[in-house]
Amino acid sequence: MGFLKGTAAALTLLSAAAAASACGVLYEQCGGIGFDGVTCCSEGLMCMKMGPYYSQCRAMPGMMGQVKPYGQCGGMNYSGKTMCSPGFKCVELNEFFSQCDLANKSPVATPKVSPTSPPGPAQVCGKEYAACGGEMFMGAKCCKFGLVCYETSGKWQSQCRAPPPKMGEVGRYAQCGGMGYMGSTMCVGGYKCMAISEGSMYKQCLPMHP
């Protein structure tokens, strides 16, 4: 009886961890008319409405006296603010530059499985948020093109997720152009900077192969 209770408790904790890990990461869609995916965002992020058809997980704005998300917070000869926004921490990239990065990096943990090496033609690689590994997992341990298998709940679960953007790259579905835009126009791999509709003044990193 004690074993069964322990097993039930472990399964309950696993289910809760899996539900929490399914919340959207930075630049993931989290709402909009017709959207049927997850509507929560990871710690340190908020679901920002971009229009009636599209909402996106964005970093929470910095409060008075705090460095905004992904802003500089340290480095040689730096004399500015060092306190990051809630959910972010000051991370040293090199001796000259430290940046406010997400405090909880679980969605971008070290990949455990190659995203481009399917185990065999009989197995179908997982789509985004599909399970791809973990204790007693018996399914395909690979993900579709452009996704990586990340360990999201320790040894219990791994999930197919999109890799984070590299320095200078714009994340999936993030703005990459348009009237008054001054940021980077280079999208992450597999995505292209395109107008969201004909004649639109707003450009976004969209899949090359929808």
From Swiss-Prot:
Residues 23-62, 63-105, 125-165, 166-210 form the CBM1 domain. InterPro entries: CBD_sf (IPR035971), Cellulose-bd_dom_fun (IPR000254). GO terms for molecular function: cellulose binding. PROSITE patterns: CBM1_1 (PS00562), CBM1_2 (PS51164). Keywords: Repeat, Signal. It comes from Porphyra purpurea (Red seaweed). One of its GO terms (biological process) is carbohydrate metabolic process. This is Putative polysaccharide-binding protein. GO terms for cellular component: extracellular region. SMART domains: fCBD (SM00236). It comes from the Eukaryota. Residues 1-22 form the signal peptide. The keyword Lipoprotein does not apply. The keyword Chaperone does not apply.
